[in-house]
């Protein structure tokens, strides 16, 4: 899919996305092709909810990382991730999927967060990670 000016492609060893003091850092030691796509505020999508960024790994795509940088509303962030997965379900059908919520405050592995992780895995075949302020991923 062509994302136009909303995407940048790189093989850099360190790739980041940052917004309002919240940050995801992707460690790419083997120099894989990574396409960083700004979804919210750039892509013209009819659906209202969407996550902030997604990262497509390799060509053809073998893995997708969906990212929502959020204040403290974990449920809203979860809904935005699910909406984005649904929008790109054809393009990312069989890919390994990871979803990251990087929030300013996160309830300590409480039952609500655990339930969201279970639901995401069951319904969308995607792992959900919830972090405070910063998250790190190695691909």
Go through each PLM region and give its residues.
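Solvent-exposed, charged helical/coil patches
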Residues: 1-32
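Domain-level recognition of nuclease-like catalytic cores that cleave nucleotide substrates
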Residues: 2-4, 42, 101-139
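Active-site-adjacent loop/helix micro-motif of nuclease/hydrolase catalytic cores
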Residues: 45-46, 73-81, 110
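Conserved catalytic cores of phosphodiester-cleaving nucleases, focusing on short active-site segments
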Residues: 53-55, 63-71
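Glycine-rich, often proline-containing surface loops adjacent to acidic residues and nearby aromatics
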Residues: 60-66, 96-98
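Nucleic-acid nuclease catalytic cores
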Residues: 74, 88-113
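An active-site-proximal "capping" alpha-helix that borders the catalytic cofactor pocket
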Residues: 84
